[in-house]
Amino acid sequence: MKINKKAALHNLGCKVNAYETEAMKQILENAGYEIVPFTEYADVYVVNTCSVTNMADRKSRQMLHKAKKMNPDAIVVGAGCYVQTKEAEALLDDTVDIVIGNNKKHELLAMLEAYENDHGKYGNVIDINHEKQEYEEMFLERTAEHTRAFIKVQDGCNQFCSYCIIPFARGRVRSRNSEDVIREVKRLAEHGFREIVLTGIHLSSYGVDTGDNLLHLIREVHNVDGIERIRLGSLEPRIVTDGFAAALAGLPKICPHFHLSLQSGCDATLQRMNRRYDTREYEEGCQILRKYFDHPAITTDVIVGFPGETEEEFAVTKEYLERIHFYEMHIFQYSKREGTKAAVMEHQVPEPVKKERSNILLALEKKMSEEFREYYVGKQVTALMEEAYEFEGETYFTGYTKEYVKIAVKSAADLSNQFVKGTIRGRLTDDIYLMVEF
């Protein structure tokens, strides 16, 4: 039924948030709303907020205020992590009409209808940390991506790293029923998607609350016809055992592209962060992956300037990163997050020092990434093509190998969602390699 109303959504934050934003978009579409870009006039604006840093809180507030400025008469909905952790602040904000916390996003339509009936400010934020919660099922019938679909299979985190607010924003681990996951994967395969990415707030914890486990879920997804590639979201190092890696290596659809969260290469820093592994365990995980997969892509996250990080500790981290030799590293300068233990730790590192250390590791990341990709020059690979790319007056199509190396094929034809085999001949741009078909 067409209701002659327009809705616009804006996502802030992680892949899980992006999945939930897409699900809310489909809820509104199915109810008859016309979805328009967030920069356009709309009757309803939904901002799925983020709270991972104080800056994320600020950006969330800015986007909510921007929505109200675009149409003062619009219903502005604040959803997600910022309003979950700052409920009172959000409820006092005159620009926000409806506040929806985590695990309640599926009630968006009902909240809109209730607001329109009596025009009173609505808040629906549960105490996500002290009530036993079930997984919030939000089903995607389609996705804005063209070849690769992200599937949320887990929510919540039980780790409580000293710098992180997410366990308080997302609550305890909640795993999605595997049957619901497979039903969604099959639907996406029917719509032509050939690559699936399993994602969650703490993916490695999948099944700890239900008696299931991540490996079993991966095997189930692997059995779905039409899906030809499976990628995994961020993994905890301790999940990587010989048994786990050997099982993955026996599944041909698995992409040898693994994101193992590290944060620091110094054990003393890891202890202050309350990370539940040491550098020896982490390195063993990388060695295991390299034993079962040929030249796997291993990527990671690193925080520089964590409270108490001395020059000596940073030097230890840098040497460790060089030894592991990652494909890609996401480098973050430590940012105080109100409400975390790290925010009140002594020996906070000055901002100029954080920036200097970040620049050092960014240069190292660039060098290691180039070395990893250069390995494939002269080798035959298969890439799943995604989109057209214009370069120096020529038309190419770009895509990714299983290891997530971006390549380009010279072609005026539409190659999207097709597998193309060829030999990598060299570099087209700084981060795109040229592949010749055969």
How should these model regions be labeled?
Residues 160, 164-171, 230-238, 264-275, ...:
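Conserved strand-turn element in the central/C-terminal portion of the radical SAM core barrel
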